[in-house]
């Protein structure tokens, strides 16, 4: 009996999801904060981007906080893209928190608690700490293991270009060296306070020890001077993270689970007092960040009242709000106001307006999106998508790119042609054609009273119910 085996190979694709604003890497400004026509994924909206550049400078200076900025404009005019560009330009050191207006309505947290947490996530604290480090090249590691499996003992010989020292090793340090796979010739750094071992690389003097090296092997110079050095380390945390850690016995676990719950105001007051002391002593530096609230018209009057008060607080970020509403009711009231915001909050805000894109800007954006999604469009297909975007919306035409690609792949083509876009246009309705369809067949839909006419035509045969 013969047993046949068959080899099967499967290619695993990496997870590379493309979001709506993944092509944006900044605001596209030059050194003088003047916007370029098309740069860093941003196209058009020159006046709005110039205004966002001023806000960017305010945040980077760090001297101004507690300001409200409202970005108002019609749908599909790049309001969220403007905020994403601002967050990319700020970098990792400045906290940036983005939420939607509907996120704060939860059964677990009150509205004010959810807003407070969002505000405090947007305030960073740079805590300076002086630590003693031992940096040098490992000459030799001797580890003596007991036959009975008891405590391990060992010696570590470490050197710089100027000196060499032998350290006695305890059980914890031996485990750390084993975990980091430290060998003779490695350049390491040991934190004396915590015992943390960091592998910096391999010494240039040992570069010829092996014929083959891994791709992640890094060669560094042997450290100079003293073995023990003092180094200032800066830790950046948000106020919310400090709140969570101090709110319960094992609060640091809540940072990973997300189960923060309501945090008492007394805890926050104590933290504010302590942070103020650190600031006076020069141990900490406050970094006002940015809180971006999209669809801000979804908030109600109580939330707007809270934001008014929170903006006056000592620890307040710059709040950027976005809305596409015109004259509409403020949620929770019967009063109409511009953009659906109360007049007192509008009075505190500086307002940036966005305008509809023209055909050339839509074409540029669609070109950037097709490059980001790795879709090859023919010039005629790009022109057709531009016309569709001008007549319907930019979102609809950009959504058709990936759909048209699937249709093109169905006919074994790598390039999206006009017929692929036309087929996608016929298969998927835009909002205007959808409204027209609903109006035409309104009688066949369930209305707001729960009634529907299920008969297709007046002259159709109906069931006889007169018996």
UniProtKB/Swiss-Prot annotation:
SUPFAM superfamilies: P-loop containing nucleoside triphosphate hydrolases. It comes from Kluyveromyces lactis (strain ATCC 8585 / CBS 2359 / DSM 70799 / NBRC 1267 / NRRL Y-1140 / WM37) (Yeast). It is an enzyme of class 3 (hydrolase). It is found in: Nucleus. Its EC number is 3.6.4.12. Its main location: nucleus. PANTHER family: RUVB-RELATED REPTIN AND PONTIN. InterPro entries: AAA+_ATPase, P-loop_NTPase, RuvB-like, RuvB-like_C, RuvBL1/2_DNA/RNA_bd_dom, TIP49_P-loop. May form heterododecamers with RVB1. Component of the SWR1 chromatin remodeling complex, the INO80 chromatin remodeling complex, and of the R2TP complex. GO terms for molecular function: ATP binding; ATP hydrolysis activity; ATP-dependent activity, acting on DNA; helicase activity. It catalyses: ATP + H2O = ADP + phosphate + H(+). DNA helicase which participates in several chromatin remodeling complexes, including the SWR1 and the INO80 complexes. The SWR1 complex mediates the ATP-dependent exchange of histone H2A for the H2A variant HZT1 leading to transcriptional regulation of selected genes by chromatin remodeling. The INO80 complex remodels chromatin by shifting nucleosomes and is involved in DNA repair. Also involved in pre-rRNA processing. Pfam families: TIP49, TIP49_C. Belongs to the RuvB family. Keywords: Activator, ATP-binding, Chromatin regulator, DNA damage, DNA repair, Helicase, Hydrolase, Nucleotide-binding, Nucleus, rRNA processing, Transcription, Transcription regulation. GO terms for biological process: chromatin organization; DNA repair; rRNA processing. ATP binds at residues 73-80. This is RuvB-like helicase 2. GO terms for cellular component: nucleus.
